[in-house]
């Protein structure tokens, strides 16, 4: 991303395809967010930006954050294609931007979970199966 593209990105509000994280969430929460993006319309996670206020905080160790993100994806997500991870310098700070495509082989699950997560507005929700699917044992 160019600085101009990054600025346009952080000027947007969180929603179905955009999530801001001031710092690294728990591995479970990040896995749910990533798989929810894959199961819905794809999306972008910007690390180093406070959600709600959009205050820029930066990421102290972008390479360390990338390693953590990759490990969580490898250990907790059942993905067929890895998201794109970029480092962005802006305003004298470093940010990590993770771009998740819409998945082609849905549903994507978090390891140990039996139901997929989807993105609804700016939150992740467990997808509900239709009554017919539940009765069939799907």
Where in this protein do the model-derived segments appear?
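Conserved N-terminal catalytic/coupling substructures associated with nucleotide/phosphate chemistry
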Residues: 1-138
């Amino acid at each position: 991303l160019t600085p101009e593209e990054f600025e346009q990105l952080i000027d947007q509000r969180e929603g179905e395809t955009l999530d801001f994280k001031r710092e690294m969430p728990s591995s479970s929460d990040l896995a749910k967010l990533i798989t929810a993006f894959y199961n819905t319309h794809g999306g972008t996670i910007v690390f180093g930006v406070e959600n709600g206020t959009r205050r820029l905080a930066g990421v102290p160790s972008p390479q360390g954050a990338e390693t953590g993100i990759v490990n969580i994806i490898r250990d907790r997500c059942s993905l067929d294609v890895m998201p794109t991870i970029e480092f962005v310098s802006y305003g004298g700070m470093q940010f990590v931007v993770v771009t998740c495509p819409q998945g082609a082989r849905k549903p994507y699950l978090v390891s140990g979970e039996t139901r997929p997560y989807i993105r609804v507005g700016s939150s992740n929700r467990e997808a509900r199966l239709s009554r017919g699917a539940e009765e069939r044992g799907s």
